[in-house]
Amino acid sequence: MILMKDIVRDGDPVLRQVAQKLTFPLSDHYRKLADDMMEYLVNSQDPKIAAKHQLRAGVGLAAPQVGEGVSMAALLVPDDKGEIIFKEVYVNPEIISESVRKTCLSEGEGCLSVDKVIDGYVPRPNKVTVHYWTVDGEEKAIRLKGYPAIVSGHEIDHLNGHLFYDRINKENPFALDEDTIVIY
């Protein structure tokens, strides 16, 4: 079971490296890693389990965040009522198309690997198409909009050595294009 002590923190070099692509079939080690990352997200969104194990809630977790420099990320995205609207483990994902129009979260973004609050909007494409493989080696492409697109972008950024605050406007952290969609 992944706990907060297992989450790599900002400053660790693995978070700034481009993750290595995985080959199929996945080894038992990487299949277990996928299961463990999803288990963390499920547990972190359950108030009783999260309190018992002192887990910070998460909607996505990339392999580099647990010290594994490979291209894999788990996503468990709820809507504003807490219902799960997207659940997947991406292997070797890439965003192959994105909208010009941006979106962002009204509260900004956070990250399990970043312990401090960093104020500012994190503009991301409102719509993305993600090409990836499942843990079982099935090739997929999915079009996402809004919050699932934001979470996908955040996790894929991890796999490319970027953190959310890299996208915040340094001169004016709350500046947005006038057609940016602000959600939640």
Curated annotation (Swiss-Prot):
Q: Which cofactor does it need?
A: Fe(2+)
One MF term in the entry's GO annotations: peptide deformylase activity
Q: Which residues bind Fe cation?
A: 111, 154, 158
Q: Which Gene3D superfamilies match?
A: Peptide deformylase
- Co-factor binding comment: Binds 1 Fe(2+) ion.
Q: Which UniProt keywords apply?
A: Hydrolase, Iron, Metal-binding, Protein biosynthesis
Q: Which residues form the active site?
A: 155
Task: Give the family this protein belongs to, as stated in its UniProt record.
Answer: Belongs to the polypeptide deformylase family.
Highest taxon, organism lineage: Bacteria
Record the organism.
Lactobacillus delbrueckii subsp. bulgaricus (strain ATCC BAA-365 / Lb-18)
The protein depicted here goes by the name Peptide deformylase
Query: Its Enzyme Commission number?
Result: 3.5.1.88
The record, for PANTHER family, names:
PEPTIDE DEFORMYLASE, PEPTIDE DEFORMYLASE 2
Question: Could you tell me which InterPro entries the record lists for this protein?
Answer: Peptide_deformylase, Peptide_deformylase_sf
Look at the named UniProt entry and state the broad enzyme category this protein falls under: hydrolase
Q: What does this protein do?
A: Removes the formyl group from the N-terminal Met of newly synthesized proteins. Requires at least a dipeptide for an efficient rate of reaction. N-terminal L-methionine is a prerequisite for activity but the enzyme has broad specificity at other positions.
The primary gene name is def
Listed under catalytic activity are: N-terminal N-formyl-L-methionyl-[peptide] + H2O = N-terminal L-methionyl-[peptide] + formate
Q: Name one GO biological process term.
A: co-translational protein modification
The record's annotation in Pfam families points to: Pep_deformylase (PF01327)
